[in-house]
Design a protein with these regions (language model features):
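Alpha-helical interaction segments
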Residues: 34, 38, 113, 151, ...
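C-terminal structured interaction module
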Residues: 200-264
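Short, functionally important structural connectors and interaction interfaces within domains
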Residues: 33, 59, 145-147, 199, ...
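N-terminal, charged low-complexity regulatory/assembly segments
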Residues: 1-132
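Hydrophobic packing positions characteristic
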Residues: 81-209
């Protein structure tokens, strides 16, 4: 057997849920006085899958805490069968878990669980995102008056955006605080959660619907500051003050970068 063929067989064996090796692989290995080749392979197989389960539990502690060991491991093993590790780093092992849940469970069960998984993954993405230089209040104070109307901004790389239709934040907080998990409940109104990294600390904040629409307008749809004020015209003379208040909050949070008008 060529080395490449042997390596492929070992990989297929480790990725399989069945701990019994095929005869060709087993016969290629030597037993010792204390351990047979089949026993050695089984130990390696179990250790590998245990490490994958450990990684998924670490990435999704709230999902794990909500389901418990047995149900989480059953879900995780089904996920690993459908999505074997394809990356050299365990960092990306759980990237598709939320989408998998949507197709694996019936919709009534999948919706709150996949939303919680997306929330946890958003925290992971925020922490690992590339650095960005946030626009500061000091820089804004120095901005010439004529530049305010054309001001455009974008989100920093670490900022993640999630619309929650269930009490996923309450479940996540219960896990963080090691408290009792509340029952999963649909929200009366959807909740927009923004997650970002502040130096080495991951932070989050829930936004009211009007603030979420304003932030999305400026950072996704490309509104200028003048256009934001225009969207708030129903507030009358209070529109500029509301726009400035939101902008100050976003800058204090450290969410934004300025888009240079000179860039193409």
């Amino acid at each position: 057997m060529r080395l490449s063929e042997w390596q492929a067989q070992v990989q297929a064996y480790l990725l399989s849920r069945d701990a019994r090796p095929n005869p060709a692989l087993q016969s290629s290995l030597l037993s010792s006085a204390a351990l047979s080749a089949e026993q050695g392979l089984a130990i390696y197989h179990n250790a590998y899958r245990a490490r994958l389960l450990e990684a998924l539990r670490g990435d999704y502690p709230a999902v794990h805490g909500w389901l418990g060991d047995e149900e989480f491991d059953a879900l995780a093993l089904a996920y690993l069968d459908a999505h074997p590790s394809q990356h050299f780093s365990l960092r990306w092992l759980g990237a598709q878990l939320a989408d998998f849940i949507d197709g694996y469970l019936v919709p009534a069960q999948a919706a709150p669980l996949s939303e919680l998984a997306r929330l946890e993954w958003a925290f992971t993405l925020a922490f690992d995102a590339p650095d960005g230089l946030p626009l500061s209040l000091t820089q804004m104070a120095e901005l010439p008056a004529e530049d305010w109307p054309i001001l455009q901004v974008r989100l920093l790389p670490s900022v993640q955006w999630l619309v929650c239709r269930h009490n996923s934040l309450a479940l996540w907080r219960a896990c963080k605080e090691q408290g009792d998990f509340p029952g999963s409940q649909p929200l009366e109104e959807v909740e927009t959660c923004v997650i970002w990294r502040d130096q080495l600390i991951t932070r989050y904040r829930s936004l009211a619907a009007d603030e979420a629409a304003a932030l999305q307008g400026m950072t996704v749809h490309g509104w200028s500051f003048a256009e934001l004020c225009g969207e708030l015209a129903h507030l009358g003379e209070q529109a500029p003050a509301q726009a400035v208040g939101w902008l100050r909050q976003w800058l204090t949070d450290g969410l934004l970068q300025r888009i240079d008008s000179a860039q193409p």
